[in-house]
């Protein structure tokens, strides 16, 4: 109404005056946006002289206040050089950082300054990686070195990052690309891309919107930095998260993770391959052969002296390679450094100005392994299950080793975890048997079968449950708050029921709690209310992103295969802010599969410590055979592992009188013993034996030289392809529905066989250009694990490629077990349907292939390797590949059944004697083996294995299995979507992927289009109340939500926004350089300085007012809302290693955007926005009225306090009011005025 009345009044002016008025207003706005506030004020005064409207008068008043504020702030913000790195950081921010955090910022800047494309910040959990990144970005933005940053993280960490940005850098423009409102997401992203700032999004949003994040106005958009938090999400290069992350163009990439290695070194390779864009560690095939295999073998207790020496030297070489790109500090390391330099951190304070707990004085942590005996009932079922086949048939749903392990783990925890049918057959109580159980539907509803059982029965059926109930009662009496972690929701159900019946006050977070606001509410309740003595959490959900320092005791009910998973759970308590001693109880049953799982945890931990530089030569606890024995039943009354650790570390325990009394009490509970997990690897091994071996063997030195040369060569090849544009990271084409459907109907047409393609730039023909001419002579047909293989040099001609290499006839090279040849091509990321391999295998067998994919090649023996690089040996790599690593590709064969048929085109290696085969046959064998590599960690799809060997496939391969199955389902869904009748009703944007590997393959390949959501073009107003000039011009721009205060409502997902303009960072936010003129308007303001808030508000004052008009027009997308719920539920899924669980794919992880199912109600302009990806349910009417009353009362109270001269109290009231309703310009300006008075 106000806008229409203003227009009516303007129309009463003469055309000349109206034109002048609108011109002055428009020019004044442009001047304000460009930072020229004096010119803007002058133009608004000219407009006022023509027609003095209320809006013009209001803007003149705001500009005058802003100019007065700037005039008072004549001094520049003060900056300090961080650790003499050259990066200037705002002094107030710098003084709040710990010393190790300053060193981390200097490391991040050194990556940029030295021209490295990326790196990994792998500090231990709880050392403040978030703060380091925020402070680093503050310095980079202040220096105008970056403009656009994309930050990707798990969903449950969004609020944490938004709060930290608002606290540490209130002047930084931070927007969230998340939530159910597509228009709001798009507007936030566009604002950052047009100006500068940080976009925060989630991995699930990345999966569904990677095209939008990678483009701007139809062109590829290159981010200055792409930063991944919890980067172990991409530990497998073939997962969809990793593929989509690679599709985002970026100048620099940073990874944050407290667990860079969780299971094997391939995960470390995957992280560096992404961070450094393939320019550091070569291809996965060569890395595994030259680095991973020797290092893993050297960590086993029964390794030979030569293997230990080789592993030590290879590990040192790997550390030298990654050192410039990798920084990791543990809590122990930082505390030790502080003890050596006590003056390093005097007078540190937190952002609120209060003294905080010095992290270097973190209290003691005792990590105890409590060895539990199985009860007679559990022991009887356990032994029978392992030894009798008919018992397995009763208890198992699918016959696979992994499913057997799942059943054994359930038996160790509680027999009631088995299905109701199995409980009835085992005569466990009088559990009911329903038809649902006959269909093997095991879900939470099965818990109803134990509702009628008494608590005493539930406790007495599990040795762990007996110990846990006694422990929790004792801890409650002592006044401790305890976290209880389990991988099973059913276990948490049992524990929760037992504790409630014992009148415990408990809280719980698991995968069923999908709303972030609900999780935060429970966390805050536990942190602030000591009456809640127990917090129940699933390991996967509660182990990441939570701070629960109110607890001092942690119970891990069941061990995970992944040592990092349990370590993350412990670090929810033992982190910065913890002031009390922490005790951890890991419950493990004696002689069972859990003890074997713990052994593998220790082995993986030794691998992690060595490869990340924590320990040069960690202690070796177990032999290879001991690690393999998963299904053997040991002594179930005592633990061999416990006795071994007792002998090694019994005298090293750090304790006090209270802890000694507590441990004595634990022994009274009938446990088998206690070990100290925190003392593992405290005994360093002498490297004398390895050093003696190094002096005697030139082979080891030459082997290390060879490994380094190969990865460097492959990395250089990758960089060359990237610089020549052969493998671009972003490709997009749009087609109309008719074109899509036309292409879709051609899927069944016979096509010439396409050549094999690679989907990652780093997984190319790894060493074909260097080693393709080597002939390997077999010395013995059947050999032990360490056989000899001799290498002679020959000249091999393959098509148009000519390879030549010369060396002495006596040189020796070694191949690891299971490798067909040195020249095998890594195709770990080759994505194909599972059934395609079987058909392809049959087809190749019909052609007469005799080579077995799993055939072992001659293995290693100590000798010498003389490597002479020659220019003639460097040949070009086959046809150019114009495909990026970020695209999921599928081939369609010309056969009737449409099975996949791939052919390798890499240069061949001639193998003499019995290993020789025709080139075509060997190519086929390599193609088969390449596909087998996709499943090498999958016991469910691999050929039957002996039970004792099965553990070799247990390296957390669920991601790979789910990835393969989900990609096949995704391919089917895409075909259906292309043929859908709805495709003809509206325009869709699609990504067309060309599967050609050469210019000639345009007609030989097929096109798969990825369906995206239809987009309705809308024009949104950027000005307030549909200004008069908008009515004349009819032009509108995007709207935006503003929250300019560091203490503003987190529900808005907005931190304060810096000044916009052609180069806003140069105008207000850059450190002052020598020789610059210091004026009141052009003084430098840091994003970390709260004084920058004044400029923020002035810059976007129109946007703040516009929210009142445009917020009512926002529409949310129910489809995406459901998608966000599904995302969080997926992120919270418990770890259940059963056959049925592992067989299920990640149904929500796809590259297509889901269609909205129904129109969403319009949101109120005054309603608070949801604080998570899941929209909050509509509040009741009375709650809305109460919130309105609270707002009015807070504003009134703030005005009264202001009149009384109580500035701080008034400011607090107004800030709380803004948290309820942040779009009131009057209250915001009043708040700014109070803040200004406090700063004077």
Swiss-Prot record:
The keyword Lipoprotein does not apply. InterPro entries: Helicase_ATP-bd (IPR014001), Helicase_C-like (IPR001650), P-loop_NTPase (IPR027417), SNF2-like_sf (IPR038718), SNF2/RAD54-like_C (IPR049730), SNF2_N (IPR000330), SNF2_RAD54_helicase_repair (IPR050496). It is found in: Chromosome, Centromere; Chromosome, Centromere, Kinetochore; Chromosome. Its EC number is 3.6.4.12. Residues 467-631 form the Helicase C-terminal domain. Gene3D superfamilies: P-loop containing nucleotide triphosphate hydrolases, Tandem AAA-ATPase domain. GO terms for biological process: cell division. GO terms for cellular component: kinetochore. Residues 110-278 form the Helicase ATP-binding domain. GO terms for molecular function: ATP binding; ATP hydrolysis activity; DNA binding; DNA translocase activity; helicase activity. The keyword ATP-binding applies. Transmembrane segments: none annotated. Its main location: nucleus. Keywords: ATP-binding, Cell cycle, Cell division, Centromere, Chromosome, DNA-binding, Helicase, Hydrolase, Kinetochore, Mitosis, Nucleotide-binding, Phosphoprotein, Repeat, TPR repeat. A motif (DEAH box) lies at residues 229-232. Residues 1104-1117 have a biased composition (Acidic residues). Residues 748-760, 795-809, 978-998, 1049-1065, 1135-1165 have a biased composition (Polar residues). It catalyses: ATP + H2O = ADP + phosphate + H(+). Expressed mainly in the neural tube and heart of 10.5 dpc embryo. Significantly down-regulated after alcohol exposure in embryonic brain and heart, but not in embryonic kidney, liver, or lung. It is an enzyme of class 3 (hydrolase). TPR repeats lie at residues 21-54, 1191-1224. ATP binds at residues 123-130. PROSITE patterns: HELICASE_ATP_BIND_1, HELICASE_CTER. The modification Phosphothreonine is found at residue 1057. DNA helicase that acts as a tension sensor that associates with catenated DNA which is stretched under tension until it is resolved during anaphase. Functions as ATP-dependent DNA translocase. Can promote Holliday junction branch migration (in vitro). This is DNA excision repair protein ERCC-6-like. It comes from Mus musculus.
């Amino acid at each position: 109404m106000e806008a229409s009345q203003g227009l009516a009044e303007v129309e009463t002016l003469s055309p000349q005056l109206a034109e002048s008025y609108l011109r002055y207003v428009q020019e004044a706005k442009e001047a304000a946006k460009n930072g020229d506030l004096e010119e803007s004020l002058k133009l608004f005064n000219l407009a006022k002289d023509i027609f003095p409207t209320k809006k013009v008068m209001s803007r003149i008043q705001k500009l005058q206040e802003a100019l007065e504020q700037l005039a008072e702030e004549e001094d520049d913000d003060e900056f300090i050089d961080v650790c003499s790195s050259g990066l200037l950081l705002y002094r107030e921010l710098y003084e709040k950082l710990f010393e190790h955090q300053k060193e981390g910022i200097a490391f991040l800047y050194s990556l940029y300054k030295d021209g490295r494309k990326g790196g990994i910040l792998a500090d231990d959990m709880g050392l403040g990686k978030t703060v380091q990144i925020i402070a680093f970005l503050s310095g980079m933005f202040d220096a105008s070195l970056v403009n656009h940053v994309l930050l990707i993280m798990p969903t449950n960490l969004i609020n944490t990052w938004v709060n930290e940005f608002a606290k540490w850098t209130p002047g930084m423009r931070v927007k969230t690309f998340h939530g159910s409102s597509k228009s709001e997401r798009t507007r936030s992203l566009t604002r950052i891309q047009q100006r500068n700032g940080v976009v925060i999004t989630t991995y699930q949003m990345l999966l569904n919107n990677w095209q939008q994040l990678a483009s701007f106005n139809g062109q590829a958009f290159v981010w200055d930095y792409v930063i991944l938090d919890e980067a172990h999400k991409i530990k497998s290069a073939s997962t969809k998260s990793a593929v989509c992350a690679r599709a985002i163009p970026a100048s620099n990439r940073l990874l944050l993770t407290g667990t860079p290695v969780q299971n094997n070194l391939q995960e470390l390779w995957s992280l560096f391959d992404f961070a450094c864009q393939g320019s550091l560690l070569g291809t996965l095939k060569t890395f595994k052969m030259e680095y991973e295999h020797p290092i893993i073998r050297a960590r086993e207790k029964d390794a030979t002296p030569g293997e230990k020496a080789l592993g030590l030297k290879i590990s040192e070489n790997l550390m030298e390679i990654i050192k410039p790109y990798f920084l990791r500090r543990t809590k122990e390391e930082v505390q030790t450094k502080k003890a050596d330099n006590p003056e390093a951190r005097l007078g540190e304070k937190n952002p609120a100005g209060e003294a905080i707990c010095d992290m270097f004085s973190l209290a003691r942590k005792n990590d105890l392994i409590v060895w539990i005996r199985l009860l007679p009932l559990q022991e009887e079922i356990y032994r029978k299950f392992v030894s009798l086949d008919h018992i397995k048939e009763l208890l198992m749903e699918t016959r696979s080793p992994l499913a057997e392990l799942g059943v054994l783990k359930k038996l160790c925890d509680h027999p009631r975890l088995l299905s109701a049918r199995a409980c009835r057959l085992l005569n466990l109580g009088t559990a009911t048997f329903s038809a649902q159980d006959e269909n093997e539907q095991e879900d939470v509803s099965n818990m109803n079968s134990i509702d009628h059982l008494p608590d005493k029965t539930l406790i007495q059926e599990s040795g762990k449950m007996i110990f846990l109930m006694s422990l929790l009662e004792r801890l409650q009496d002592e006044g401790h708050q305890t976290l209880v972690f389990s991988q099973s929701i059913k276990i948490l159900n049992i524990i929760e029921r037992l504790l409630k019946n014992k009148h415990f006050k408990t809280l719980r977070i698991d995968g069923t709690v999908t709303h972030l606001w609900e999780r935060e509410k429970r966390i805050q309740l536990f942190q602030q209310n000591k009456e809640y003595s127990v917090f129940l959490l699933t390991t996967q959900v509660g182990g990441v992103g939570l701070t629960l320092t109110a607890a001092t005791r942690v119970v891990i009910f069941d061990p995970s295969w992944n040592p990092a998973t349990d370590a993350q759970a412990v670090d929810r308590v033992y982190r910065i802010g913890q002031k009390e001693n922490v005790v951890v109880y890991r419950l493990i049953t004696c002689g069972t599969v859990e003890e074997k799982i713990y052994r593998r945890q220790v082995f993986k931990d030794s691998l992690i410590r060595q490869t990340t530089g924590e320990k040069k030569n960690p202690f070796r606890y177990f032999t290879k055979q001991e690690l393999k024995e998963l299904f053997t039943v040991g002594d179930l009354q005592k633990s061999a592992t416990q006795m071994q650790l007792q002998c090694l570390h019994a005298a090293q325990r750090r304790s006090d009188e209270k802890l000694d009394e507590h441990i004595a009490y634990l022994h009274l509970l009938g446990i088998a013993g206690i070990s100290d997990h925190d003392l593992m690897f405290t005994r360093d091994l002498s490297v004398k034996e390895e050093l003696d071996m190094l002096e005697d063997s030139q082979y080891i030195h030459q082997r290390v030289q060879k490994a380094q040369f190969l990865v460097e060569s492959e990395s250089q090849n990758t960089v060359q392809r990237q610089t020549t544009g052969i493998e671009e990271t972003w490709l997009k084409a749009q087609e109309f529905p008719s074109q899509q459907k036309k292409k879709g109907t051609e899927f069944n047409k016979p096509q010439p066989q396409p050549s094999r393609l690679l989907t990652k730039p780093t997984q190319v023909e790894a060493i074909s250009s260097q080693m393709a001419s080597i002939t390997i002579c077999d010395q013995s047909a059947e050999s032990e694990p360490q056989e000899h293989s001799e290498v002679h040099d020959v000249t091999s001609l393959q098509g148009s490629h000519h390879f030549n290499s010369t060396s002495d006839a006596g040189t020796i090279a070694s191949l690891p077990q299971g490798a067909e040849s040195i020249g095998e091509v890594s195709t770990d990321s080759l994505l194909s349907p599972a059934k395609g391999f079987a058909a392809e295998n049959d087809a190749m067998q019909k052609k007469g292939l005799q080579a077995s994919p799993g055939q072992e090649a001659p293995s290693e023996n100590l000798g010498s390797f003389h490597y002479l690089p020659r220019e003639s040996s460097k040949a070009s790599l086959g046809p150019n590949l114009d495909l990026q690593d970020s695209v999921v590709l599928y081939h369609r064969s010309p056969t009737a059944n449409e099975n996949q048929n791939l052919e390798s085109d890499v240069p061949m290696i001639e193998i003499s004697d019995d290993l020789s085969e025709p080139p075509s046959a060997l190519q086929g064998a390599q193609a088969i083996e390449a596909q087998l590599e996709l499943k090498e960690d999958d016991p469910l799809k691999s050929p039957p294995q002996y039970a004792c060997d099965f553990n070799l496939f247990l390296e957390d391969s669920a991601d790979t299995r789910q990835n393969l199955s989900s990609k096949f389902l995704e391919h089917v869904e895409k075909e259906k979507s292309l043929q859908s009748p709805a495709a003809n009703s509206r325009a869709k944007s699609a990504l067309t992927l060309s599967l050609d590997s050469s210019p000639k393959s345009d007609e030989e390949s097929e096109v798969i289009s990825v369906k995206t959501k239809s987009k309705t073009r809308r024009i949104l107003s950027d000005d307030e109340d549909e200004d008069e000039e908008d009515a004349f011009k009819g032009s509108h721009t995007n709207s935006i939500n503003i929250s300019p205060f560091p203490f503003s409502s987190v529900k808005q997902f907005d931190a304060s926004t810096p000044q916009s303009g052609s180069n806003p960072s140069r105008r207000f936010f850059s450190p002052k350089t020598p020789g610059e003129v210091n004026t009141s308007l052009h003084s430098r303001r840091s994003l970390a300085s709260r004084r920058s808030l004044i400029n923020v508000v002035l810059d976007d004052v129109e946007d703040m007012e516009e929210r009142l008009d445009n917020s009512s027009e926002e529409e949310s997308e129910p489809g995406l809302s459901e998608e966000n719920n599904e995302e969080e539920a997926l992120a919270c899924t418990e770890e259940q290693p059963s056959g049925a669980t592992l067989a299920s794919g990640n149904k929500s992880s796809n590259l297509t955007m889901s269609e909205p199912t129904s129109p969403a109600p319009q949101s109120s302009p005054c309603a608070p926005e949801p604080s998570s990806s899941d929209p909050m349910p509509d509040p009741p009417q009375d709650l809305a009225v109460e919130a309105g009353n609270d707002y009015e009362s807070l504003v009134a109270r703030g005005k009264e306090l202001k009149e009384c001269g109580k500035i701080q109290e008034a400011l607090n009231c107004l800030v709380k009011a803004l948290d309820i309703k942040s779009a009131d310009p009057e209250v915001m300006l009043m708040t700014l005025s109070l803040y200004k008075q406090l700063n004077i």
